[in-house]
Amino acid sequence: MSNESKCPFKHTAGEGTSNRDWWPGQLNLKILHQHSRLSDPMAEGFDYAAEFKTLDLAAVKRDLQALMTDSQPWWPADFGHYGPLFIRMAWHSAGTYRIADGRGGAGGGQQRFAPLNSWPDNVSLDKARRLIWPIKQKYGRKISWADLIILTGNVALESMGFKTFGFAGGRQDVWEPEDNVYWGSETTWLDDQRYSGDRELENPLGAVQMGLIYVNPEGPNGNPDPLAAARDIRETFARMAMDDEETVALIAGGHTFGKTHGAGPATHVGPEPEAAGLEEQGLGWKSSFGTGVGGDAITSGLEVIWTTTPTRWSNDFFDHLFGYEWELTTSPAGAHQWRPKAGAGADSVPDPHDPNKRRTPSMLTTDLSLRFDPAYEAISRRFHEHPEQLAEAFSRAWFKLTHRDMGPRARYLGPEVPAEELIWQDPIPAVNHPLIDAQDIQQLKGQILNSGLSVAQLVSTAWASASTFRGSDKRGGANGARIRLAPQKDWEVNQPQQLAQVLQGLEALQSAFNSAQSTGKRVSLADLIVLGGCAAVELAAKNAGYSISVPFAPGRMDASQEQTDVESFAVLEPVADGFRNYLKPVSGITAEALLVDRAQLLTLTAPQLTVLLGGLRVLGANVGQSPHGVFTSRPGTLSNDFFVNLLDMGTQWKPQSEARDLYEGSDRATGQYKWSGTRVDLLLGSNSQLRALAEVYAAADAGEQFVKDFVAAWDKVMNLDRFDLR
C-alpha cells in the first residue's frame, strides 16, 4: 500500500452539477447580488471620490509620460513608444459600452476580468495593463484601475502631440466579473449567431461577433468588402451613441498611431489569460513565433502600419487613404488587408523595431470604408482638407467614448474636467435658489393629498419618473423632471393622459407655492413629483394602520427640452416594467427575465424587488389601472395582501392564453373566480427563492416589516440619481 497521502475528496466546494445545468432556463437572481461587501477588499466606508481628490494627478501623468518611452524587453514598445498600445487599451475598455441597456464601458475596470480580459479582440492588452501596474501600485487606492486605464490613454495621446478635450475621474473599481452583461449566446469565439434576417443585429449587443469590441477589421465575417463593412461600422458605432462624424473621427484619429500585429500564423499563439497556466501569472497568448514579442508579435493577425508618423499626431491617415489606390493582399498570418497598388508608397513608413528597415503603408478593410461609403467619404474628405476639424472632432469623440458610461457631470472628479456642458451628459441646471424646508414639505404634502389626485396616480407618476434610472450608465432618474418632456411624456408605459393630469395638478401647486415666496425659495417640479409619491405612500401606510415618515430630500431641478436629446433618451423607454405590470412582447425573452433585468438596472436586491412589486400592486400602480396582480380588496392601502393572497393554497391558478402570459386564480373548492395575474405576479409564488422572500412578507406578523421595507426600497429608487447626496 502506498504511503502517499490520499485526499478523501474528489471535488471541492462550488464544483459539481449546478442548478443551471439541471434547469438551463432557471431565472438568474444572482445578478441582483453582485459586488457586495463580501467581495470588496476595501475598508467599510471607503470613499473613492475622497481618495481621488487627494491624488496628485499631475504627478501620475508625469509617471505615465515617462513610461511611454521606457521600453521593456519582456514586451518591447513599437517605434519605441507605448502610446498606441495604451490608446487601444483605453479604447477597448470604454468601447464595450452600448446604449440599449447602458451596460459595458470603462466603469469598474472590467477589462481586468473574464470574459473581457480573454476576448480575442483584447489580445496583448494584458501586457498593457501589466506595464502600468507599477504606477497603480505606487498610487494605490487614490486611483482606480478603471480611472488609470482611461487616464493612460489620454496621456498617450498627449505624449504624441494631441490636445485632449479633458479627463474626469470617478470610476470606482469592482472586484469580480459582472455576470449581468449579456455579451451574446454564442459558445465559440468570433461566432455571429446574433444576426437574423437582413443582417439585423440582436439587441442590446453592439459588436458584430462574440469577442470583438466593434466590427471585424477584415470585413463582415472576414469578407473584405469596404461597403459591407461600412454598414456594420455604422450600426455598431450608433449602438454606442456615435454618429457618422464621430465614427470617422474615432477611426481616423485612432489609426493615426501605431500598428496592428500579425507577424505569423495564429497557430503559434497560446491560450488566453483565463486558460493559461499558473506560471503565466495572469498573462496569456504566449507566442512561439520567433521571440514572440516585438517584431514577432501576433495580436489580431493583421500587419498594418497606417502612417509615416505612428507616434505623432498628423493628418497622414487621410493623406494615405486618398493618396493611394488600394489592392487586396494578406498579412503574414493570412488575414485580409490592403496595400497601395503598383508598389506605391514602398519604404515610406518606419519599421517598428529596426531603424534600418522601412515598410509600405497599409490599410484595413474597415479603413477603406471611410473612403468608399458615400457619407463617410464626404466627412473624411472634409477632415482631410481641414485637419483642425478632425482634431476637434476626435478630441470630443474620444472624450465621449471614454466618459459615456459615467453619467452626469456631477460624478466627474479632478482638475481636468471640461467646463463645457455637453448634451450627451443629460445636463440638469444647478440649484440656484433656497430649498424647501421641513415645514414647507409638510405643507406641500397636505396640498398634494388634497388636490384630488389619487394614491395610485401619485405613486405611479413618481415611480415612472424615478425608475428610468440605469445603474449601468447612471442615466435617467427623477432629477430633471424629464417625464414632462419628450420623449418620456409620450411613452405608453407612462400613461400620457393620466400623466398630463397629474403634472397639471402638481404644476399648479408649484406655481402657487413659488409665487408666494418672498425669499427666493423655490420648489422644482422634479421634487414635487417625488414628494407626491412619498405623501401617497405615507397615506397608504396610514390606511393600513402604520404611521411612518417616508424620507424626502429636496434639491432636484427641472431640465429643459433643449437640454434633452430626444433620440438619446428614447433608448431608456422600457419594453417591460414588471413593477407596473407592463409588457411589450419581446421575442425570446420572458416577462420574468425582463423583470429581473429591470431590477438589476435599478440596483435592487431580490428582497427589494419582492417588497416593491408587492407594494406597488396594492397601491394600484399598474399601467392602465389593470387589475392583474392586485390581490387585495382594499387598493390604496399599503398592506401585505398581495403576498397573503398569492400564497393562499385555497387558490388554484390556470393559464388563460396559449402564450401563458395571463393566469386566472379561482377558489380551489368552488371554482369561483378570485384574481387575475401575469407571469410576473405568479413568479413570486413559483420561483423557490422569491417564494421564500414572499413568505416572509405573507406572515401574520409581517405587516409592519413589510411597510418599513417597502419605504426603504422606495426611498432608494427615488434617490438613485441623487449623486449630490452621496
Swiss-Prot record:
PTM (free text): Formation of the three residue Trp-Tyr-Met cross-link is important for the catalase, but not the peroxidase activity of the enzyme.
Enzyme class: oxidoreductase
Site (Transition state stabilizer): 88
Pfam families, sorted: peroxidase
Cofactor annotation remark: Binds 1 heme b (iron(II)-protoporphyrin IX) group per dimer.
Cofactor(s) the protein needs: heme b
Biological processes, Gene Ontology terms: cellular response to hydrogen peroxide; hydrogen peroxide catabolic process
UniProt xrefs under InterPro entries: Catalase_peroxidase (IPR000763), Haem_peroxidase (IPR002016), Haem_peroxidase_sf (IPR010255), Peroxidases_AS (IPR019794), Peroxidases_heam-ligand_BS (IPR019793)
Ranges annotated as spanning the membrane: none
Chain positions of cross-link Tryptophyl-tyrosyl-methioninium (Trp-Tyr) (with M-240): 91-214
Gene Ontology terms: cellular component: cytosol
Active site: 92
Catalytic activity: H2O2 + AH2 = A + 2 H2O; 2 H2O2 = O2 + 2 H2O
Binding positions for heme b per the UniProt entry: 255
Gene3D superfamilies: 1.10.520.10, Peroxidase, domain 2
EC number of this enzyme: 1.11.1.21
Assembly description: Homodimer or homotetramer.
Annotated family: Belongs to the peroxidase family. Peroxidase/catalase subfamily.
Protein name: Catalase-peroxidase
